[in-house]
Structures are given as C-alpha cells and as structure tokens.
C-alpha cells in the first residue's frame, strides 16, 4: 500500500487505476467520465422509449427533438439516400467560379450555415463586458497547435499523413477522382501551412489580457482590401460596425495575401473540403465514421461511437438545453438545489476569510477582491427558462436529416449575429444541465454548476459533509478560484478588463503564479511533457479550490479527512 506522504495520487487512486478501463469510444476515463457514462446510459434508455412512442413528454420542444432523433436513428433511410441529400450543398461551393463570386456571397453563406472561412463572431467587449461587439478571430489548423509545425516536431509528419489518408478515404465517398483529391488536399495543406505561420499558439491564446486589440473599422478594412467588408456586415448585422476586436492580430496583418484573388485556388479547395465535412454527420454511417478518423487518431480513441450513441448526440445538439432541463427535473430536487446554493455561499465566505488573513496583499487590493466575490453570480442546476429561439426549432419529418439540420442551424446562426451591439444576456447558459462539467465566465463574473455534476460521487444530500466538500465543494471552490487565476485576475467585478491591483500586489501575484508554472513545467504526463504556462490557470484553480474546500470541511462538526 502506497503511503500518502510518498505518492498522494497513487495512494488515493492506485487501486482504482489497476482495474479502470477506458471505453473504446472515449479517450479518457475517471470520476467525471464515470458519471457522464451513467447519464449517457440514462439518456439512451430514455430516448429509446421516446423513439418507440413510450412516455414522450408533453412538451413541443422535446417532441421536435424526438422527431429529429427519429430521422437521425433511421440508418436504413440514410444509407439508401447516400450522399444525395448533400449534393446541392457541396456543388454550390464547387461551382464557385472566382474569388469575387465567393466574396459577394460570404454574408449569404454565413447566414445559411455554409462554409466561408470568415472567422468573425459576436461576444462581450473586454473593456465593457455589458455589451456585445464584433470580434475577428483566426482560422483553425490541421495539427493541434502551431508548435507542431516546427520541422523537428516528432509528430508532425505522422499526423499530417494520418490527416491526409482520412480525407482521401472520405472524399472518395463523394465521387471525387483520385486526381481531384490529390489536387484538393495539396492546396489545403499549402494553405494550412500558411495559417500556422500566423495564428496564435495555444499558449498565446491562453493569455486573455493580451488578446484585446481594437481596430477602428476603416483601419481594419485596409488589412483585407479585396474583401467587401462593409457590404458583408451590412447584411449580417444591419450596418457597418464602428470597430472590431482582433485577438488574432498577426493573422489579420497577413490576411491581404490570403483573402485575395491570387490565392483563390487554395481558398476554394479549403471551402470544398469544409463543405464536404459539414455534411458528414447527416449521411451514411460509413461516412460518419470516416469523417472522425483523424480526430480519433489525435485523441487515441480506438473506435467511433456506435450508431445509437451517434444518433442521440447528433439529435440532441440543437435541443441540448431542453434535454438538460428535462434531466434536471428528473434528477435534481429543490432540496438539493437549495443545499448547493448554500454551499456556494459558504465557499465564498471561506474565500473572504482567507483574504482577510492574507499577509501579502495590501488592504486596497483585498477590498477589491472581496467586491468581486460579493457580486459573483452563481447558477445552480438548470436555467430558469429556455432561450426563446427553442420554440422556433420545428422539425419536418418529410425533409431529410440534412435538410432539417440546415433549417435548425439557421435559427442559431441568426441569433448569434443578432446579439451585436446588444446588452449581454447574463442568464444565458454555456452548457446544458445534463453535462458533467462546471465553469466560471470572467466576462460575466458568474459560476455555473449544471445538475449533472451535482450527483454522487461529487454531491449527494445523504453523503457526509466532508464527502460533499471533497467532491462538489472542491469543484465550487475551483470555479471561484478562476476569478483570481492568471486570466480572471485581469477582469473586475463587472467582467471588464481592468487592472484593479496595486502594482506591488500584482507583482507579488505574478511571482507566486510563476512558482506554479515552474512546479508543473516539464513534468511527465502520460508520455508527454506538461507546459506549465499553458496549464497554470487550471493548476491555480485546483490548488486554491482544494485548499478552500478543505478549510470549509474542517468547520463542520462531522469533519473526516478520509471522507474528504
């Protein structure tokens, strides 16, 4: 038996690890995944009954989910249709004759859910988090991070070869010739290599405060003179914006050589491949499995989800908040909700007490940290109501699965653009109630705990207080800690980017977070090396979360370190 003081992780988890099995359709296992699988089993068995017409809820939104699920689960019909439902969608992109034609259709394609490689979106402003503004992001890359593109990276050649083979197999299902496939993928790889020179690395993207680069509209337009940006955004948001936030500044400074007629062949190839890939979840099962081959290679997942799981997860996508609300109604009692709400209050009080006893912060900074704690908004279990747009998600069983998917996506796309220049909706949840997860949003200064994570072993009304504090208490404290991690520390109580620290205190904070970076940097993690800078925000939240949860547990009369 391993002693705690020799190897804490092995002492706690060693026996479990000897018998733990990673499911073939998942890349990892553990406490979170065990609970997620329980919920998955519940949802699969429940929706099986719904598909058979047994116990379908008296709820129009869930009835539309069932109709959509029925189309997704009808693999015989999907097999018989083959790629035909997607042909017009793909052909429209293949038949684009020029960069000018593409540029003139960007807005229409964007609103219709067609590929544009036009990475713009609407999100809260960093400087005034109460209002939604326009952001210019950058494209993704084939490899997991820009660092993989270094010539001496040991996985570069192997992963690119796996990606290419996966796309070759996929495109062959869509009647592309070998010559067309080779030409298409050569061009996509060429363009991807260009993207990799300019887009941010994961480490760069992890430093939120360094991502804020506002551009006046005329200055930004000058970066891409061949794109009719004013026309595009007049269609998307109803007018020309006055500014855009550009986190991917390096990419956009080079974008004039990407969004140009001279580069049309490569852009066109990328658009065609994107169009094909966009259709793959909705066609035959063979195509679905082929489309996921590269991602499974990246994550080390031996096999694809089976048909039953794939149909459920595809169907729940547009309706996930409604399904989460149903789950919460079944599994999360009002008593449990009230108890968890009180635990959040308790944990915030623990943080205030820890701040009061802090010996390296000045009173000025401590007081501002307490102000931030006082206005953190906790959301427990489930949202009070569903977004209005859910009532407009109507499924037509006379249309194909792909046609319905397109119709449903139009509603969410229109909503995302309608948020521009509008007040931020603080009641909007970023994940459904049946997801085993939790989060802190620094721009809204809120913490969210879906009903799914408020289940055993993380939480149970009938567990000891120590077990609950060691489970959900640590999760709650982890999320609160994110308000003061290397990113959260840059945002004030209103969620705006604002330095509320004294210079001396922030320097002391930086010195301490650097120690966390140094502690984790280069450690072995399942055959790879930890990047201390990339993981520091999570490590800080873990350390702070466990410390605060333990302090809270010790205040209870029935405290048990072992149960914690």
UniProtKB/Swiss-Prot annotation:
Keywords: Hydrolase, Metal-binding, Metalloprotease, Protease, Zinc. The keyword DNA repair does not apply. Residues 1-564 form the Peptidase M13 domain. Its cofactor is Zn(2+). GO terms for molecular function: metal ion binding; metalloendopeptidase activity. Its EC number is 3.4.24.-. It comes from the Bacteria. One of its GO terms (biological process) is protein processing. GO terms for cellular component: plasma membrane. Coiled coil: none annotated. The keyword Cytoplasm does not apply. InterPro entries: MetalloPept_cat_dom_sf, Peptidase_M13, Peptidase_M13_C, Peptidase_M13_dom_2, Peptidase_M13_N. The active site is at residues 479, 542. Binds 1 zinc ion per subunit. Zn(2+) binds at residues 478, 482, 538. Belongs to the peptidase M13 family. This is Putative zinc metalloproteinase in scaA 5'region. It comes from Streptococcus gordonii (strain Challis / ATCC 35105 / BCRC 15272 / CH1 / DL1 / V288). The lineage of its organism: Bacteria, Bacillati, Bacillota, Bacilli, Lactobacillales.
């Amino acid at each position: 038996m391993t002693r705690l003081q020799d190897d804490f992780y092995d002492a706690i988890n060693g026996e479990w690890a000897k018998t733990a099995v990673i499911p073939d359709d998942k890349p990892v296992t553990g406490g979170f995944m065990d609970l997620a699988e329980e919920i998955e089993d519940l949802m699969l068995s429940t929706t099986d009954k719904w598909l058979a017409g047994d116990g379908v809820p008296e709820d129009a939104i869930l009835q539309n989910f069932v109709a959509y699920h029925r189309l997704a689960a009808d693999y015989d019909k999907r097999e018989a249709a083959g790629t035909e439902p997607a042909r017009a969608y793909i052909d429209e992109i293949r038949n684009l004759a020029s960069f000018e034609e593409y540029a003139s259709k960007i807005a229409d394609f964007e609103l219709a859910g067609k590929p544009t490689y036009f990475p713009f979106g609407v999100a809260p402003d960093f400087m005034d988090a109460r209002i939604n503004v326009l952001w210019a992001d950058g494209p993704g890359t084939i490899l997991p991070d820009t660092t993989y593109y270094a010539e001496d990276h040991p996985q570069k050649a192997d992963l690119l070869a796996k990606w290419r083979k996966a796309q070759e197999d996929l495109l062959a299902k869509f009647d592309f010739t070998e010559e067309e496939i080779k030409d298409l993928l050569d061009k996509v790889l060429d363009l991807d290599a260009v993207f990799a020179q300019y887009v941010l690395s994961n480490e760069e993207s992890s430093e939120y405060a360094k991502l804020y680069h506002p551009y006046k509209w005329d200055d930004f337009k000058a970066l891409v003179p061949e794109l009719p940006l004013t026309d595009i955004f007049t269609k998307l948001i109803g007018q020309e914006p006055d500014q855009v936030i550009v986190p991917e500044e390096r990419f956009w400074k080079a974008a004039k050589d990407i969004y140009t007629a001279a580069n049309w062949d490569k852009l066109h190839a990328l658009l065609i491949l994107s169009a094909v890939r966009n259709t793959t979840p909705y066609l035959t099962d063979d195509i679905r499995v082929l489309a996921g081959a590269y991602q499974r290679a990246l994550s080390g997942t031996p096999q694809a989800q089976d048909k039953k799981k794939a149909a459920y997860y595809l169907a729940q996508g547009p309706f996930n908040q409604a399904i989460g609300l149903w789950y919460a109604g079944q599994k999360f009692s009002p008593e449990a909700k009230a108890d968890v709400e009180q635990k959040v209050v308790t944990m915030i009080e623990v943080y205030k007490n820890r701040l009061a006893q802090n010996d390296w912060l000045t009173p000025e900074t401590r007081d501002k940290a307490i102000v931030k704690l006082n206005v953190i908004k906790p959301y427990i279990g489930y949202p009070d109501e569903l977004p209005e747009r859910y009532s407009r998600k109507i499924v037509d069983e006379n249309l194909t699965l792909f046609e319905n998917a397109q119709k449903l996506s139009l509603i969410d796309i229109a909503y995302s653009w309608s948020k521009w220049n509008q007040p931020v909706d603080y009641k909007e949840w970023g994940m459904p109630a049946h997801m085993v997860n939790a989060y802190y949003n620094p721009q809204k200064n809120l913490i969210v705990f879906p009903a799914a994570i408020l289940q055993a072993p993380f939480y149970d009304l009938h567990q000891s207080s120590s077990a609950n504090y060691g489970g959900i208490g640590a999760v709650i404290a982890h999320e609160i800690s994110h308000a003061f991690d290397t990113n959260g520390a840059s945002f004030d109580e209103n969620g705006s980017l604002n330095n509320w620290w004294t210079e001396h205190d922030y320097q002391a904070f930086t010195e301490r977070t650097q120690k966390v970076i140094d502690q984790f940097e280069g450690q072995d993690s399942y055959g790879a090396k930890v990047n201390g800078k990339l993981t520091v925000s999570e490590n800080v939240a873990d350390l702070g979360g466990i410390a605060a949860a333990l302090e809270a547990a010790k205040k209870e009369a029935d405290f048990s370190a072992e149960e914690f």
